[in-house]
Amino acid sequence: MSFRDLPEFLKFLEKNGQLKRISTTVKTDLEITEISRRVLAQGGPALLFENVIKADGSKSTIPVVTNLYASIKRICIGLNLKSPAELRELGALLAFLKQPQIPESFKETLSILPLAKRIFSMSPKTIAKGACHEVVIVKPNINILPIQKCWPEDISPLITWGIVVTKGPTKDRVDHYNLGIYRMQVVSENKLLMRWLKLRGGAEHHKRWKTKKKELFPAAVVIGANPVITLAAVTPIPENVSEYNFAGLLGNKKIELVQCKTIDLKVPAHSEIVLEGYVSLAEYLPEGPFGDHTGYYNDVEEFPIFTVTAITMKKKPIYLSTYTGKPPDEPAILGEALNEIFIPILHQQFPEIVDFWFPPEGCSYRVVVVSIKKSYPGHAKRIMLGIWSYLRQFMYNKFIIVVDDDIDVRNWQEVIWAIATRSDPKRDTSFIDNSPIDYLDFASPKSGLGSKMGIDATDKMYPETNRKWGKKIEMSQEVIDKIDSMWDGLNI
């Protein structure tokens, strides 16, 4: 089932026991975070806070929803998928879009045509009026929004689920519409800080704009959108596909866009709230500290100022929010879903990969365990180097553990057993120095530059070892089958 907008999605979730209304008065300052954190830890529903007190002590006229994507089930519902198993099918589609294979026959060519036609037919549709323009405020005050302060030492309230819409300075494909989710620190009534990492789409547009244009860089921030738009913004979509097109493909319906009121950008017409404005090319301010997905407060660093020129919204909007902290948190759960999407993409490039796992406690991407069908000496190291260099999302990975296909990568007991029995610390550990690292990683020797470690925990073959390799203990299948047939009668 696809949804037109966020309220329609919430209505469906509530009907199916996946949303809980909170009528008790709560504060945006810390209280929403603590309630959301406890419910998420219990595997609970999305939360709709109907009576919210803002940072200035006034009551918000806008309700707040949190934990919306804090379960794989809700993510699948939002992506218009029937089950988590279909996440890999979605990954297979992305793998095809990223690197289409040449058809081997006329029949195969015919089978691909409907998919290609469907992709290109999902270009967004511009309409004259949108629900997000029911209220237009041209003298904007950000403080009308119930923006969360997530952690005690956060320097200010923080917009956490804003979809930032940008375009580059040219008509080249690389400058087409980009959707990205970046946190934004509140600085004043009409100013925010745009915290985007250097290699993200919005930051790349901003960088190219500096070299091509003299005028300010327009950007729009969408808060509360159709779930396929939100999830398209966090999915590893190939650069040759627009997030708007991909969202239309997910929802099986063209995304309706509307022209912004004060800037030359188009945004989803059924958005709850939109902040229009310009990102400065020269003015930067210190951002942070804020609690982050690592479970620590991040360092202070300068980011460009986003000046809001208008706030547009529905008559009765809903404010979508989240928090980030030590896993489990909402980004970690989204990471679990994205993990399933990554597997077919990786398998297309490395067919020997059997399974791939970003443990949530590894802070989204810092630790990965991968199993392979090993077929030659040095195979594990080739996989390490391949993963580190293949996708931009893996650039900041610090630790890769490679195991054989008899090991369940999602079971730490098996992974640790493989490391303990199949690896030698000197022979089977590889290091790479002076490699790109997430600048938020304070454990690295230099900001943005650190090392990577790979552990080969696979069975060894000549010439990796000259010793006789151990034989794995396994019960005979005949005995297993016999005991299976006897089991109920044993009354154990």
Curated annotation (Swiss-Prot):
GO terms for molecular function: 3-octaprenyl-4-hydroxybenzoate carboxy-lyase activity. GO terms for biological process: ubiquinone biosynthetic process. InterPro entries: UbiD (IPR002830), UbiD-like_C (IPR049381), UbiD-like_N (IPR049383), UbiD_Rift_dom (IPR048304). GO terms for cellular component: cytosol. It holds the Pfam family UbiD. Belongs to the UbiD family. PANTHER family: 3-OCTAPRENYL-4-HYDROXYBENZOATE CARBOXY-LYASE-RELATED, FERULIC ACID DECARBOXYLASE 1. This is Uncharacterized protein RP821. It comes from Rickettsia prowazekii (strain Madrid E). The lineage of its organism: Bacteria, Pseudomonadati, Pseudomonadota, Alphaproteobacteria, Rickettsiales.
